[in-house]
């Protein structure tokens, strides 16, 4: 039996699946991956992306932060791909209980997923730091320089977790809950290099830990099933 056939059999036998995904889930929708060879970290800017996407850079160089953010982080024309849609189908069928994602693009919800735990926030939520008014991603995209609140003139910040910022505690606790209760944990499209997110797999207690990634990860030896392939290729074969 091939590794993909084994995977399909596992999905069939499971009814408490959790999917934990990273940038590789959205690359097939045309959204750049930070850490892949042709990803954002290997492109040339005045500052490395991890510096630009930090809290201190946002505070001290807000306009420059937003120039990069609009250019590279707001991919509003991107559409969900096969993996997003299959995960939504699995949830609708009652087999998948949660999607835990490191992505900020909102494509899981666009595909129909309901229970999505966004560890790093979402580009679709933005708020005024002064009065708390919320704004959508289009407002940010269409504004010039530093976006300001149309009610009070306050500075607007995206609801995304920047470097030097902590993850939302409730989202983390929810992720731990779902992963610790899962009978199958599928991890896809993540280098498993960012903590505390990568540490979440320590909470999985089952024997169906599946890693789907084109490249190797530090956790490969812990997987019950390792599939080195594109996510779309694998998920495209699931029949719900």
PLM features: residue spans?
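Conserved catalytic core of sirtuin-type NAD+-dependent deacylases
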Residues: 1-240
């Amino acid at each position: 039996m091939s590794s993909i056939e084994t995977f399909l059999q596992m999905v069939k036998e499971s009814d408490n699946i959790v999917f934990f995904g990273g940038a590789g889930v959205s690359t097939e929708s045309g959204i750049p991956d930070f850490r892949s060879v042709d990803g954002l970290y290997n492109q040339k800017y005045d500052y490395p992306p991890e510096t630009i996407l930090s809290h201190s850079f946002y505070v001290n160089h807000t306009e420059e932060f937003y120039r990069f953010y609009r250019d590279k982080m707001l991919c509003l024309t991107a559409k969900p791909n096969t993996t997003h849609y299959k995960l939504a189908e699995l949830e609708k069928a009652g087999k998948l209980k949660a999607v835990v994602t490191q992505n900020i693009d909102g494509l899981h919800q666009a595909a129909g997923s309901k229970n999505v735990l966004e560890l790093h926030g979402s580009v679709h939520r933005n708020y005024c730091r002064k009065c708390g008014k919320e704004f959508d991603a289009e407002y940010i995209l269409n504004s010039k320089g530093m976006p300001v609140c149309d009610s009070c003139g306050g500075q607007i910040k995206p609801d995304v977790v920047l470097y030097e910022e902590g993850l939302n505690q409730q989202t983390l606790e929810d992720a731990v809950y779902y992963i610790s209760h899962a009978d199958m944990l599928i991890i896809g499209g993540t280098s498993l290099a960012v903590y505390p997110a990568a540490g979440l797999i320590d909470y999985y207690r089952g024997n169906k830990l599946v890693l789907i990634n084109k490249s190797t990860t530090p956790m490969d030896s812990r997987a019950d099933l390792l599939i080195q392939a594109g996510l779309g290729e694998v998920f495209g074969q699931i029949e719900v």
